[in-house]
Design a protein with these regions (language model features):
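Short, Lys/Arg-rich, polar N-terminal cytosolic tail immediately upstream
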Residues: 1-16
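Membrane-interface junctions at the ends of membrane-embedded or membrane-associated helices
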Residues: 70-78, 165-168, 221-234, 275-287
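Juxtamembrane transmembrane-helix termini
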Residues: 5, 54-86, 90-113, 299
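Membrane-interface helix-loop-helix regions
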Residues: 87-153, 264-272
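Aromatic-enriched alpha-helical transmembrane segments of multi-pass intramembrane proteins
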Residues: 21, 38, 119-260, 301-307
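Functionally critical transmembrane alpha-helices in membrane proteins and complexes, commonly lining
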Residues: 15-71, 88-91, 208-209, 293-297
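Alpha-helical transmembrane segments of multi-pass integral membrane proteins
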Residues: 242-307
Length: 307
């Protein structure tokens, strides 16, 4: 009896026993390093560095952790408040800091363009004409790394909406939603062609192409008891398959889906969760990854400006 209980205890999956903090920090650091090389040292970075896509890893980890946070919340509203309030104030501060820094280097001009553009930034609308002093500063594209934030907020809202519907459904429903979210990614280019300008704008600000990356994390969270033990054993196999697929895509110029090859993305998601549960529990008191992710472009821009 005692032996059986011991075995059961070992098999019992421990959700908290993960090192996602490290992976998050690593990914944010990775994105930062890539931007620094690209913009400050102005050299072409080997495509190999695009394989490990920090954004995909961050989306996938969100998908794995956010539904858990939803479960712990008293209600949907509390969840949204907790999540969105974590992101938005710090994002606004970051945007304001970015504007102040740009103004310090290039002089501040208050006009209609600036006001519309600035309000747009605050509500995640990225495609508005930039004021000149912003375009003249740094790499000329204001905080190019913030484009993922609008999708993160959308993920939270979608989670809040469909969580109850999905919660106790059978496996086939989950598989169906997974396939549907992959299909959304695949139809994006066709929609871009047939839709009028307004529709195109909506799509470029929507998480359609990225939702499957987040949902892959959610799917693994839902079936974590079965999936995680397998993934922590097969993670090296996933890495080998991932590298093989990446080499194949590079070699033959193949890419399934928008943004990044779908097979690579899914393998990367499997790797993320596999590695996340391979090193026991590692937690940071402060989550640096978000701050790094937010602020590194301000620094990059200053360096580019000083030249």
């Amino acid at each position: 009896g005692e032996v059986m209980n011991k075995v059961k205890e070992q098999i019992k999956f421990d959700f908290a026993n993960n090192c996602f903090d490290v992976l998050r920090l690593y990914s944010a650091f990775y994105v930062m390093t890539l931007h620094i090389f690209r913009h400050i040292r102005l050299q072409e970075v080997s495509p190999v560095f695009d394989w490990w896509n920090g954004v995909v890893v961050l989306f996938c980890i969100s998908g794995f952790l956010v539904p858990a946070s939803m479960e712990r919340s008293k209600n949907t509203w509390e969840f949204l408040k907790k999540r969105v309030l974590r992101i938005i104030p710090s994002l606004w501060v970051c945007i304001i800091v970015g504007v102040i820094v740009a103004a310090a280097f290039c002089g501040f001009v208050l006009n209609k363009t600036f006001v519309t553009w600035f309000l747009g930034q605050l509500v995640f609308i990225r495609d508005l004409p930039q004021p000149d002093f912003i375009s003249n500063f740094g790499i000329g594209n204001f905080q190019a790394n913030l484009w993922t934030m609008i999708f993160t907020v959308q993920f939270y809202i979608i989670t809040a909406i469909i969580y109850r519907f999905l919660k106790n459904r059978k496996l086939w429903v989950w598989i169906f939603v997974m396939i549907l979210s992959m299909a959304l990614n695949l139809v994006v280019p066709h929609l871009q062609e047939i839709l009028p300008e307004a529709g195109r704008l909506i799509i470029s600000h929507s998480c359609m192409p990225y939702f499957y990356m987040y949902f892959a994390g959610w799917f693994m969270y839902r079936y974590r008891e079965k999936i995680v033990p397998i993934l922590s054993k097969t993670k090296i196999l996933c890495v080998i398959l991932f590298i093989a697929r990446a080499i194949y895509c590079d070699r033959f110029g193949v890419r399934i889906g928008e943004y990044m090859d779908m097979i690579q993305v899914l393998l990367l998601c499997l790797m993320t969760v596999g590695f996340g549960y391979s090193f026991g529990k590692i937690r940071f008191k402060f989550d640096l990854s978000y701050g790094l992710y937010l602020y590194h472009m301000v620094v990059v821009d200053i360096f580019v400006q000083i030249g």
